[in-house]
């Protein structure tokens, strides 16, 4: 069944093995800062490419996507924009939150992700 196939993917293990677990359990400030630098390439613009899909959707799909985007854009409150929240995190870590500031430090997988999201949005 579909539940059996997806069951293992949808349940987080008690002891994680991913990056978030590493940062929580063993990570140092330098690790968090390096992670934020990489993620800044995506998170400082995160909702914009997704919004480009709205004109291509209709009905329930469009309404659902618009609801997600409403949250991404802070539910109408500028201080709650997800990109703003990430910029605040970067500032708290002593990092420059200017979009694209760390482009030259971006690793290949992150650059692929950012470019792919923009291409799919177009």
Language-model features: locations:
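Non-heme di-metal
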Residues: 1-122
């Amino acid at each position: 069944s579909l539940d059996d196939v997806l069951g293992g993917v949808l349940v987080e293990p008690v002891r994680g093995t991913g990056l978030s677990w590493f940062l929580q359990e063993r990570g140092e400030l330098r690790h968090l800062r390096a992670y934020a630098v990489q993620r800044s390439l995506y998170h400082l613009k995160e909702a914009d490419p997704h919004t480009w899909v709205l004109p291509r959707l209709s009905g329930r799909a469009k309404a659902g996507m618009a609801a997600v985007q409403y949250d991404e854009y802070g539910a109408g409150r500028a201080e709650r924009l997800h990109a703003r929240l990430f910029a605040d995190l970067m500032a708290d870590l002593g990092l420059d939150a200017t979009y694209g500031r760390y482009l030259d430090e971006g690793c290949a997988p992150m650059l692929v992700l950012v470019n792919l999201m923009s291409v799919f949005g177009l």
